[in-house]
Amino acid sequence: MYKRQATICHRAFAYAVDDIAVLAAGEDPMGHIRNQLADAINKLNNARLFSHLAGLFGTALGANKLDVAKAGARATEVNFLTASTIARARNLLGERGEDLDILIVHPTVAYYLYQVGMLTFSTSALSTGTNLTWGGGGVGISDRAVGEFAGCTVVVDSAVNTVAPSSSSGHQTEFFCYLTTSGTILEGQQSALRIEAERNILSKQDVLSVDYHTAYHVMGTKWNDAGDNPTNANLATANKWAITYDADLIPLVQLTVNTPLDTSTY
């Protein structure tokens, strides 16, 4: 009998500000650090999560990924994120594909959806349409956010490409996207976030120390390595993961796409 198993990651960092810096800045640098602390931790956690997902899809969840990116330059509509692409991704899970209701994308992909949503189509094909007008309907009329697409709530995060989909020379830049459901990706903590501060009178410094001990876990998967406290690079390593459910019972799909808003190549 297989058991699901998460791996705990221990993370910590510290900052120090000396009196000379305060005098030179004429402000409170430590105050600025405190104001940015929550955003900084979220950014670090997101990078860790997407490293985790890249590792899972390396081998263990290989059956649940769809790559429509062009193996070269000059990608076209078939290589972009479209409703058709979403349908193909749902199909990987069979009848359970209908459960997928969250779409996680890079901002560059999201702004392409925004661009397309501001068009009124008089033809059936984006690539061959000749009578397209801006501002006719869809998103962007009163709200710049891409709230939903193809039946999914859209979550935008630049950390999705923490692990690059490809680095093949001459390939147009590729982007990961993830389809999932609420409750598939879980977060647990071994101990709560701890923030400590003190004054070092010898060095004339204010010191701030932060540590947290948490785990991300995708239902139906397991950490398949004897070691614990992995780095992000270890989390992204394919052979360190396994699945304990059949792949189509795990509501998580990875897509790899291009976008016309970034035509740069590796």
Residue ranges, per PLM feature:
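Long, contiguous amphipathic alpha-helices that act as assembly "spine/axial" helices in icosahedral shell
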Residues: 4-62, 95-104, 109, 193, ...
